[in-house]
């Protein structure tokens, strides 16, 4: 029997925090028509689907920290988060489909990339939902500690509000210091 896993990451363009990736092997009974790219869903719908997916699949989350992003760059950190998610799966898939155009370095796994896979492949869509909800929960927690930056609404992306707060309050330990405009301020 062929076991297919889908993988996607979130948080690459954010100015703060870790990048998250999820790997998902869907149960055959799951309604694949419900699964869409996380970016096209409301927060409430993502959270509802995340519970449904977790209940009806084998899944795992990987992440790469802010320090790892600064050390190895965002592309390699994203691939590292994907690799960690794949390796955490309880079952080894016979094929792993990865959103994008790059593959993590993972021996003894059959990997294929799918450009815009989060819009085409249900297991990748499911991975995008789990990764997004997981990262959003982490960022929401951070926003309570650092409430001047609007992270609860901007997820750490470079919005006007966030950039204004950086100028006013400075950067935090969660800001990615190698990312412009943060690096321009240092």
UniProtKB/Swiss-Prot annotation:
Location of the protein in the cell? Cytoplasm
Q: Tell me the protein's name.
A: Ribonuclease HII
Its UniProt entry gives the catalysed reaction(s) as: Endonucleolytic cleavage to 5'-phosphomonoester
Where does the RNase H type-2 domain lie? Answer: 2-186
Give me the residues that bind a divalent metal cation, please: 8-9, 99
Entry-linked PANTHER family: RIBONUCLEASE H2 SUBUNIT A, RIBONUCLEASE HII
| GO molecular function ontology, one term from the record | RNA binding
Q: Name one GO cellular component term.
A: cytoplasm
Tell me the gene name. Answer: rnhB
Gene3D superfamilies associated with the record: Ribonuclease H-like superfamily/Ribonuclease H
Q: Please give the organism.
A: Pelagibacter ubique (strain HTCC1062)
Tell me which EC number(s) this protein carries: 3.1.26.4
